[in-house]
Amino acid sequence: MNVVRMMKEDEQKKILLNYIYLSRQHAGGKDQVAINLLEGICKNKDMGACVVLCYDYAKAYLEQIAPGVTVITVKPPKKESELVRLLDIERVNTWIVPKVIRKYNIGVVFHASCTNGLRKLKVPTVMIPHDIKAVSHRVMGSVKVAWYKYLLYKVMYAVDFKHADKIIAISKADRSEIQNYYARYKDKIVQIYNPIKVHVNDVIPPTPKKGDIVAINLQFHHKNIITLIKAFEMIADCIDLSLI
């Protein structure tokens, strides 16, 4: 989905990129999709059309990716537990985001993850849950999500999906899980694929294969398997191994 295109009806309105979800250390796909979007907006020279909200530790990094972007910062919680972080994100999205919308003339809000606040905003919102495995795969092998976390996430996703105007699924697996567990919101889902970014020379001489890399997936169909295959495809001519 081209979020910038949603703004064409009113050029004075801006997009709020809600990046309050970014971790101190890169957390994989959850963070990368946000970075990819910001880089894309920067390359299209649309920096004046967006405002970024984040915890203060992410400010310098985001400004490096997109020089000139307007960045609004919030101080992170002093304690770093999962529950404290989740509650603080809910606080920011429930009370601070509406103020940012009014002050910066925001027309669309993009949430880079879940936990989007306890009330529906007055402007359209787009969100990416990334996956709902705490609900859909409570038990995976020897790992089991605690019952209170299961209930918390089950309610949180329901509230987020109810308030969102569009829900972005990063893969067919994510889309089918959301449709299965939250069927009433299936018409809001838009599926995309978040590409990885690897710099490889355009012309690479083939290398004779000397062995194999074996990848085993015994859990369930997941976008990470697609990412693995695509990543290997990009470097296949650089190494002397085949992927099985």
List where the protein language model places each region.
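Carbohydrate transferase catalytic cores enriched for Leloir-type hexosyltransferases
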Residues: 2-244
